[in-house]
Amino acid sequence: MREGIHPEYHHNTVVKCACGNTFTTGSVKEELKVEICSKCHPFFTGKQKIVDVGGRVDKFNKRFNIGSK
């Protein structure tokens, strides 16, 4: 491998979220800023919004007259 072509790896990179949560990880950057993390993401907080997929299927069937036979 060639010397001097790889970026310097930082073992204690601080990750800052928009919600105020901070944690450390490894990266080639010294600091990372993210908009969403596991502390504020709806999937991890349990505050998920259920999407009504059934309504979309009914709309499709109605549009193409499927199931009315």
UniProtKB/Swiss-Prot annotation:
GO terms for biological process: translation. Coiled coil: none annotated. Pfam families: Ribosomal_L31. Binds 1 zinc ion per subunit. Disulfide bonds: none annotated. One of its GO terms (cellular component) is ribonucleoprotein complex. The keyword RNA-binding applies. Keywords: Metal-binding, Ribonucleoprotein, Ribosomal protein, RNA-binding, rRNA-binding, Zinc. Its cofactor is Zn(2+). One of its GO terms (molecular function) is structural constituent of ribosome. Zn(2+) binds at residues 17, 19, 37, 40. SUPFAM superfamilies: L28p-like. Gene3D superfamilies: Ribosomal protein L31. Belongs to the bacterial ribosomal protein bL31 family. Type A subfamily. HAMAP family: Ribosomal_bL31_1. Binds the 23S rRNA. Part of the 50S ribosomal subunit. This is Large ribosomal subunit protein bL31. It comes from Clostridium beijerinckii (strain ATCC 51743 / NCIMB 8052) (Clostridium acetobutylicum). The lineage of its organism: Bacteria, Bacillati, Bacillota, Clostridia, Eubacteriales. The gene is rpmE.
